Amino acid sequence: MKVNVLLAVFLVVMVVTDHCHALFGLIPSMMGGLVSAFKGRRKLQMEARFQPQNKNYRKRELDLENLFTHMPDY
């Protein structure tokens, strides 16, 4: 009887440990998502501050990003 109880307790501990490990692995990725969301919002605020003569630089930067995304990786 003791062996059955010990086996059940061991399995419960293993399941709880696995779930805790998954949760603690999820927390850093959630923090990264929050940081990128705030950076994106800050980027939009900075773009609103650009003067019209400087907006052309941002367009060129986007064109280069578009060009690089379509280039094959060597």
UniProtKB/Swiss-Prot annotation:
It is found in: Secreted; Target cell membrane. The modification Lysine amide is found at K39. The keyword Nucleotidyltransferase does not apply. Expressed by the venom gland. Residues 44-74 form a propeptide. GO terms for biological process: defense response to bacterium. GO terms for cellular component: extracellular region; membrane; other organism cell membrane. Residues 1-22 form the signal peptide. Its main location: secreted. Belongs to the non-disulfide-bridged peptide (NDBP) superfamily. Short antimicrobial peptide (group 4) family. Cationic host defense peptide that have antibacterial activity by breaking membranes. Is more effective on Gram-positive than on Gram-negative bacteria. This is Antimicrobial peptide 36.4. The lineage of its organism: Eukaryota, Metazoa, Ecdysozoa, Arthropoda, Chelicerata.
